Amino acid sequence: MTSSQLPTPEEIRSLYQQGEEAVVAAFEQLATLVRALEQRVQVLEDQLAKNSHNSSQPPSSDGFKKPKRRGLRRPSGKQVGGQPGHPGQTLKAVAQPDRVQVHPVKRCQACQASLTTAEVTGYERRQVFELPVVRLEVIEHQAEIKPCPQCGAVNTAEFPVEVSQPVQYGPRFKAQVVYFNQYHHLPIERTSEVMVDLYQQPLSGGTVVAASQQAAQQVTPVNTAIKAHLIETSEPLHLDETGLRVAEQLHWVHVASTADLTYLELNARRGAQAHADIGILPQRQGYVVHDDYPAYYQYQIAQHVSCNAHHLRELIFLHERYQQLWAEQLLTLLLEIKQAVETAQQAGQTALTPSQVVDFERRYQALLDQGYQANPPPVPDPDRPKRRGKPKQSPARNLLDRLHQRRSAVLAFMYDFKVPFDNNQAERDLRMVKLKQKVSGCFRTQHGAQTFCAIRSYISTARKQGLSILDALHLALAGTPFFPPALQPSALSDA
């Protein structure tokens, strides 16, 4: 029986006349339908109750009615505003200005007498920081042609390697084109408009694409070195992925990153096959930080670390949606452990005391036990046919199982201070991929998406190293891309 096949009044009277057994059977069918509808309503209400602060949904999905956020940060004791020692960005006068413009005093403000011939006794100074008028500089390269006085052969000098065309743009100009198109996500046509507005230089869309492709090709050796280094580094490696529409199909951009390096790669798959294609996770033996997506755990040679930011959001959801007291208490405990680790680090300690670890582990297990008592396993319906696989569980039970089975990954930050509490590093490194998708909607070709990932890996790494993005792109387009210090030949040989 379905909701569209409910009995009519005539059918109900007929059932009543058939006797008690017929009525009981009809009620059992209706009860089964009600339970199914209740489960469906619960799933739909759960979806509506989720937002950016209690799930992995992005803030852009919240709409105009922002949810009331639960503050997860604890008071730091710091005053509001800039902190002592903060460098600031105050505009300050310089000792040697580029140009001085003198404003003469012509008449006395008191008696109106002429001051044209009066002696200047001093100056009140004010400085204006302004852009000069910018125009493209055209550099003509001339290769000498000389006949040989001995044999008469005509000889022509060689042009520099970077001067390969009769007319072309230089690396600094192309760096700005790539900067606007790839870093600030301006579409091709708007990038062309910007170059006209800034330099009065019309630019075709093909030139923008060609500049980006050239930059991607030039930074390939850097990205290859980054990828190899991330496999071997002793630092915790952050992993994540996000969906991207490419050539009318769903693809995935995978990130592997540290605080100093970023590597992005496009793949048509999300899970284990993508990790095998990329080749970082299968060879990784150190810490890997990620969410609870099961495909990550298929590679057991790595030391897995679970992102607790995801756990906090799920615990908030369970407490708000189902009033699960244990969820709020476990959230508080995780934040308490995090605070204890930070306090110990500030005190110069390298680990928590054994008594602290034992106490936190005991309280963690006690809250899991409390959660299991509040969320017993589902009771199979004897009237329903058996299905393959595990019976469907509640969201609370699923989270409890993950927190229990992967407790070492959840609490890894407590055992080793090198391990971060969350996977925010990878999420930050993927954020610009989503911004690019918001601006452009999709990539029409795989080659365009791969170009974006290659350039984004390079400029994200350069930014982490404190290098100007424009300077990094100029170096790449000039044929000498920037290599981070950790990837220099001397550093690699020492390692």
Q: Residue spans of the language-model regions?
A:
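Short, flexible loop/hinge motifs at secondary-structure junctions
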Residues: M1-Q168, S234, L239
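Catalytic center-proximal scaffold of phosphoryl-transfer enzymes
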Residues: Q17, A143-P147, G152-A495
